[in-house]
Amino acid sequence: RFKKIRRLGALPGLTSKRPRSGSDLKNQLRSGKRSQYRIRLEEKQKLRFHYGLTERQLLKYVHIAGKAKGSTGQILLQLLEMRLDNILFRLGMASTIPGARQLVNHRHILVNGRIVDIPSYRCKPRDIITTKNKQRSKALIQNFIASSPHQEELPNHLTIDPLQYKGLVNQIIDSKWIGLKIN
C-alpha cells in the first residue's frame, strides 16, 4: 500500500497517510522524461487503487461512460463517485474506501431500508443510507464519524445526520467535488 502511495502520490481513498516530500524528489531524479504511455498508466492506476477496482471492473465503467452522452472522463468519475462504498467514505462513515467496502460486505448498511451487501451498488439521488438497527453496527459507524477529520468538507451532493447515523444523496456529484486529482 505504501509503495503505491509513494509511486502515485496521495490516494485519500486508500489510506489517510501521505507520501513524504523527499520521496517524490527521488522519483523525479530517477525517472527522467515521462512518456505519454507512462502518464496514462499512472492515472489509470490512481483510479484503480483509489476506488479499489480490478482491471475488469474499471473497463466496464469505461465502457458504460463511453456509451453515455457527454465527456467520457467526467461521466466515468461520476459513476465511480456514486458507488456505495465511496459515498460511505465521503460521508465520513468509514475512514477509507476499503473500510467502507468491509462495512457493506458485513451487512451493516441499509439503502432505502433494505440491506445492501454489494460495495459497487450505484446510488441514485434521494437514496437514504443508514446503518442497521443493531448496537454493533451503530458503534462501528459512531467510531468512524467521531474520528473523521473532514466533517466540514462534505460535498454538496451529500448530507449527513450523525446523530441518526443517516446519510442522504441529494443529487449526482458535481465535477468540482471529486476528491482525486486526475490529468
UniProtKB/Swiss-Prot annotation:
InterPro entries noted in UniProt: Ribosomal_uS4 (IPR022801), Ribosomal_uS4_bac-type (IPR005709), Ribosomal_uS4_CS (IPR018079), Ribosomal_uS4_N (IPR001912), S4_RNA-bd (IPR002942), S4_RNA-bd_sf (IPR036986)
Domain S4 RNA-binding: 82-143
Entry keywords, A to Z: Chloroplast, Plastid, Ribonucleoprotein, Ribosomal protein, RNA-binding, rRNA-binding
Annotated GO CC locations: chloroplast; small ribosomal subunit
Gene Ontology BP terms: ribosomal small subunit biogenesis; translation
SMART domains according to UniProt: Ribosomal_S4, S4
Subcellular locations according to the entry: Plastid, Chloroplast
PROSITE patterns: RIBOSOMAL_S4, S4
CDD domains: S4 (cd00165)
GO molecular-function terms, A-Z: rRNA binding; structural constituent of ribosome
Biological function: One of the primary rRNA binding proteins, it binds directly to 16S rRNA where it nucleates assembly of the body of the 30S subunit. With S5 and S12 plays an important role in translational accuracy.
The family this protein is said to belong to: Belongs to the universal ribosomal protein uS4 family.
Subunit structure: Part of the 30S ribosomal subunit. Contacts protein S5. The interaction surface between S4 and S5 is involved in control of translational fidelity.
Annotated HAMAP family: Ribosomal_uS4_B
Name this polypeptide is given: Small ribosomal subunit protein uS4c
